[in-house]
């Protein structure tokens, strides 16, 4: 469960969870086996600081999605300020064995006129960057190597043994794919009863002309980084836990 000690207020679930970006909403999808979860969650909660947690329940898993402001902690002596930075943490808690799970994060297929999108991944980061004359946006999350290195904390411990498949995909059935350069899809290794998996997604944007505002480095985050920021902030006295 995401952030079990953080107070929350239950909301009506009427809007699909999304991060609003200058190039349209960044939306999220989950498919368990061949079944896609509904766009609207079964439950939605408001947390302090303008955050939300959405929750879906199925017979084989519980899925949660945190949306939150995020401070990437870029050194101001080396990097210029970002316009904004937002993060998501997706979590699945497994109740029965699952052979295939996919999690996706994507911008609209048709971007605004003048916008150009491209793959921008690097070591430990799967990312796309979208820019036009005024704005640069990077959306990033864990690549396969980062997923293996998170084994034991954010993903099942046995996934550390999959590190060789990161460099040889000939027999691999899991990994990260760019969705026509407007998003990414994570296909996970098989999950067993009692497993959990957390994946972060960061969206950071800045003026296109400011090369010191490093949206790429801002996207280098773990789910632990994001969750630690949430729990470090004092909770609102008015927030009521209604789970």
Language model features: what each stretch is:
Residues 205-216:
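Short, Lys/Arg- and Gly-enriched loop/turn segments at beta-strand edges
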Residues 1-66, 149-158, 226-243:
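An extended acidic
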Residues 216-229:
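Glycine/proline-rich low-complexity spacer/linker segments in large multi-domain proteins
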Residues 81-129, 196:
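Acidic (Asp/Glu-rich), glycine- and aromatic
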Residues 67-85:
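Short, solvent-exposed beta-strand/turn "edge" segments of beta-rich domains on protein surfaces
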Residues 189-207:
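Short Pro-Gly-centered flexible turn/kink motifs
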Residues 112-193:
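Trp/Gly-enriched beta-strand surface patches
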């Amino acid at each position: 469960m995401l952030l079990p000690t953080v107070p929350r207020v239950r909301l009506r679930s009427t809007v699909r969870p999304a991060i609003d970006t200058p190039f349209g909403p960044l939306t999220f999808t989950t498919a368990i086996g061949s079944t896609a979860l509904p766009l609207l969650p079964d439950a939605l909660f408001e947390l302090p600081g303008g955050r939300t947690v959405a929750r879906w329940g199925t017979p084989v898993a519980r899925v949660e999605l945190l949306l939150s402001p995020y401070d990437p902690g870029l050194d101001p002596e080396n990097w210029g300020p970002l316009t904004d930075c937002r993060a998501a943490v997706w979590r699945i808690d497994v109740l029965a064995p699952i052979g295939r799970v996919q999690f996706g994060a994507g911008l609209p297929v048709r971007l605004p006129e003048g916008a150009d999108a491209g793959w921008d991944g690097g070591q430990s980061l799967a990312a796309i960057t979208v820019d036009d004359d005024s704005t640069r946006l990077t959306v990033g999350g864990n690549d396969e190597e980062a997923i293996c290195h998170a084994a034991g904390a954010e993903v099942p411990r046995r996934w550390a043994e999959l590190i060789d498949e990161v460099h040889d995909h000939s027999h691999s059935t899991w990994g990260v794919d760019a969705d026509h350069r407007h998003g990414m899809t994570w296909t996970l290794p098989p999950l067993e009863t009692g497993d959990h998996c957390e994946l972060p997604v960061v969206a950071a944007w800045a003026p296109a002309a400011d090369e010191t505002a490093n949206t790429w480095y801002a996207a280098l985050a773990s789910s632990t980084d994001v969750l630690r920021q949430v729990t470090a902030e004092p909770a609102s006295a008015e927030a009521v836990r209604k789970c």
